[in-house]
Amino acid sequence: MKILFCLLLLAITALEAGVVKRYNKRFAGFNVAGIGGNAGCVVVDNKLFANSFFLRELTTEEQRELAQYIEDSNRYKEEVKESLEERRKGWQLARDGKEDSKVLSALAEKKLPKPPKKPSFCSAGDTTQYYFDGCMVQNDKIYVGRAYVRDLTPDEVTQLKTFDAKMTAYQKYLSSTIQKQVDSLFGEKSNLFNLFADTRTEATSQASDDATAGATTTQAPVEAPEPPHFCVAIY
């Protein structure tokens, strides 16, 4: 069972990597957890960077927005810390038999605090990176390595938006296809939390239902989109 599961993970990883390695796009954003790195938005002395690339100076209004975000972020971290500590104490009492199941269930169902809203100057358009053969596009600017080349033309911006929409649809299709293949092998056990659980009867029933549904509804295949030709790589 363990060997089969490992082989399956390797196959899925290879399939996903083989399909999107040439036309990959990466989303990044503000890191509320406070872990270091150069991904997403970073502000130093009111200078805005996205994925380590300098964008511009923050305006006065954006500086006020940043100050509010910092305040909200610090409060959020404290709320998460308190919430996790509350759960830890509840589980400890339950383990010692000092707390009933209803209280423990209420703690488990209690949602964690919501993170603060990202500042308006750190949008997906600012931080999304599109990797093509030979170059990268971020914030409608073309880079070769870390060297800025030029801005996209209005027509190229439209091409990029079309590519983004098609690639998003393709990645969803690919993920759905892989999930169906996993479900056909493990049924409900494709969920990693339930993979080794004793749910044979339910898995068999689910697999049967999926097979019936698959016989009546067939999803049209989605092809990988042709990438825009913003640069030419010579091999």
UniProtKB/Swiss-Prot annotation:
Reproductive organs and muscle. GO terms for cellular component: extracellular region. The keyword Secreted applies. CDD domains: API3. SUPFAM superfamilies: Pepsin inhibitor-3 (SSF55149). PANTHER family: PROTEIN CBG07421-RELATED, PROTEIN CBG13105. Aspartyl protease inhibitor. This is Immunodominant antigen Ov33-3. It comes from Onchocerca volvulus.
